[in-house]
Amino acid sequence: MAAKLIVGLGNPGPKYSWTRHNAGFMVLDRLASLSGIQVTRKAFSGLSGDGNWSSERVYLLKPQTFMNLSGRSVAEALRFYKLSLSDLIVIHDDLDIPFGKVKLKEGGGHGGHNGLRSLAQELGSSAYARIRVGIGRPVHGDVVNFVLTNFAKEEMDSLLEVLDTSVDALEMMIKEGMPKAMSIFNAR
């Protein structure tokens, strides 16, 4: 049985729990809840857990290093589990996608996302699968402040649906492959 390292990007601590930048953590928490995998073990400068889900051995990781150092945590976990970049799936927020949309991508640049920038620096490559959770862009104001604010009330009302869509996309990536998952979820 193959294995996957599934990483949700975010910032640690209750202060950031419901911020837009923590969409990756939120999706990973939803996956953990649905799969019964506990993500509570302290390892790899993060919180981790493992189990079987969707006919795969999966290792779940929430780096606790703050976003701009997440690459260290991910690199450490990949080395420990002897996995390659093709076994890595990273879930993160994306300003360039409207709130409520979920898009899949293989490879590509960091687009100004500090977590992805850290991954590229530590891994020496961006050749891994991504689930991009749309958070939209601020109409006015600073992007940094925007990603560190909580979702608005009207967004919170539909957040669970977004998290479930992200988990569905992840499951299709694992079961049926990235091309099929991209053709379905990127068309929505």
UniProtKB/Swiss-Prot annotation:
Residues flagged as site, Discriminates between blocked and unblocked aminoacyl-tRNA: N11
Gene Ontology BP annotations: protein quality control for misfolded or incompletely synthesized proteins; rescue of stalled ribosome
Reactions that this protein is recorded to catalyse: an N-acyl-L-alpha-aminoacyl-tRNA + H2O = an N-acyl-L-amino acid + a tRNA + H(+)
Keywords (A to Z) from UniProt: Cytoplasm, Hydrolase, RNA-binding, tRNA-binding
Keyword RNA-binding applies: yes
Gene Ontology annotations for the cellular component aspect, listed alphabetically: cytoplasm
Domain of life: Bacteria
Protein name, entry field: Peptidyl-tRNA hydrolase
Biological classification of the source: Bacteria, Pseudomonadati, Thermodesulfobacteriota, Desulfuromonadia, Geobacterales
Recorded name of the encoding gene: pth
